[in-house]
Regions:
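Short glycine-rich phosphate-binding loop at a beta-alpha junction
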Residues: 1-8
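Conserved acidic residues
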Residues: 2, 67, 97
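Short, ordered loop/turn segments at secondary-structure junctions
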Residues: 9, 31-33, 102-105
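Short Gly/Thr/Asp-enriched flexible loops that form oxyanion-binding sites at enzyme active sites
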Residues: 13-22, 86
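A short helix->loop->beta-strand "cap" motif at the edges of active sites that frequently abuts
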Residues: 22-24, 93-94
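Short, glycine/charge-rich flexible loops or terminal/linker lids adjacent to PRPP-binding catalytic cores
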Residues: 23-69, 136
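Conserved G/P- and acidic residue-centered "switch" motifs that form tight phosphate/ATP-binding loops
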Residues: 74, 79
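PRPP-dependent phosphoribosyltransferase catalytic core
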Residues: 86-143
Length: 143
């Protein structure tokens, strides 16, 4: 990838580490635009988890045309944020080369986006025992 993209705020620490690993610049989409950042592209997207309409904004100079972009986020329920980020990259005339998330929920399935990788799958919380049911997606990691 040429750029690593995430949305503020919770995905930033993970995206910082990915950007450092790839030695690529990190771009952060905002939920609102800042006048000091210059002209921007904004899109409205529907969150997959709550079905609410939210806004996502990226300055026009953040990602050049034809840039290859890797999307990183911390958590995916239905995939609405990842889909919104994908649409934002397309509006910037960039190409999404992959989407990675730390944790994705098992349900709903399918998600609003098809092509993503997650490290863990969240199956739920057993309220009677307060146990969190989460499992790694990969059984082994090549070293």
């Amino acid at each position: 990838p040429d750029y690593i993209l995430t949305v503020e705020t919770k995905g930033i620490p993970l995206a910082v580490m990915v950007a450092r690993a790839f030695n690529k610049p990190l771009v952060i989409a905002r939920r609102d635009s800042k006048v000091t950042e210059g002209s921007a592209i904004s899109i409205n997207y529907v969150t997959g988890s709550s079905g609410r309409i939210q806004t996502m904004t990226l300055t026009k100079r953040a990602i050049p045309q034809n840039a290859k972009v890797l999307i990183i986020d911390d958590f995916m329920k239905a995939g609405g944020t990842a889909k919104g980020l994908t649409e934002l990259v397309h509006e910037m005339n960039g190409k999404v080369v992959g989407t990675g998330v730390l944790v994705a929920t098992a349900e709903p399935n399918p998600k609003l986006i098809n092509d993503y990788e997650s490290l863990f799958t969240f199956h739920g919380i057993d309220e009677s025992t307060n146990e969190i049911h989460i499992e790694p997606v990969f059984d082994t990691i090549d070293r």
